[in-house]
A protein has these predicted regions:
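N-terminal pre-triad scaffold of radical SAM enzymes
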Residues: 30-71, 78-102
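Conserved, mostly hydrophobic/aromatic
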Residues: 9, 33, 62, 103, ...
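Oxyanion-binding "anion nests"
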Residues: 197, 209-212
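Core AdoMet radical
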Residues: 70-89, 93-183, 192-196, 201
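Short glycine/threonine-rich loop-to-helix capping motif typified by GTGT followed
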Residues: 112, 206-209
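Short, small-residue-biased leader/transition segments that mark boundaries at the very start
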Residues: 2-6
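Acidic, glycine/proline-rich low-complexity segments that act as flexible tails and inter-domain linkers
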Residues: 7, 11-36, 40
Length: 212
């Protein structure tokens, strides 16, 4: 949590945020958040459309996700999409005024061969479609992330999902530390980061602050 009053920016610590939560009503917090957003962002929004570029049969057991092979769901299951289909989807979104386009794949990560296929898709989109590029492809290696950046991707998405102290209650097949490592590697590769989480999965109010 960070509050800014020009020219000084001040980042709240855990104890301060906890005290603010305990002594301020939800309505007051919503109003303060609205005022900060209005002051520093106004009515501007950043639009990003995602394409489910590989669906289902994920090896991870994340309790919140229908893509996991451990859950019985009725989602479509298909392999990595073709280049032409992805380019057409990006072009459709660009024609609607969307500013960013992201390929999102199920699964823990991509193989090097899959990474090369995805990078070829991004290079073609970059040549043919006026839209900025993002990616959400799992726990990639440093080398794979560098390839993405060289292919024109600007933002990498990797959600932390919840507080580190609660993560193991929701997922046992990877750790918050692995996510943090991926994010750090993405930064080193020159990518900007998009990372968030889900509120309301059984975590405590204190863990929500820990997550923030």
């Amino acid at each position: 949590v960070q509050t800014c009053a020009l020219p000084i920016c001040y980042r709240l610590g855990y104890d301060e945020a906890l005290e603010l939560m305990r002594t301020t009503s939800p309505g007051e917090l919503y109003e303060l958040a609205h005022r900060l957003r209005t002051r520093y962002q106004g009515k501007r929004i950043d639009t990003c459309s995602i394409m489910n570029a590989r669906s289902g049969r994920c090896s991870e057991d994340c309790k919140w996700c229908a893509q996991s092979k451990f859950h019985k769901t009725d989602i479509d299951v298909y392999p990595l999409v073709g280049e032409t289909e992805a380019v057409q989807e990006a072009a459709h979104n660009a024609s609607k005024g969307v500013g960013r386009f992201s390929l999102v794949t199920s699964g823990r990560t991509l193989t090097d061969a899959e990474t090369d296929r995805v990078c070829a898709i991004y290079r073609r989109i970059g040549r043919e479609v006026p839209i900025r590029l993002c990616a959400s492809l799992g726990l990639l290696t440093r080398e794979q992330l560098v390839k993405l950046r060289e292919s024109g991707v600007e933002h990498y998405h990797c959600n932390m999902e919840t507080a580190p102290s609660y993560f193991s209650k929701l997922c046992s097949t990877h750790t918050p530390e692995e996510k943090i490592r991926t994010i750090e590697w993405a930064k080193e590769a020159g990518l900007k980061i998009c990372s968030g989480g889900i509120i309301g999965m059984g975590e405590s109010a204190e863990q929500r602050i820990e997550f923030a």
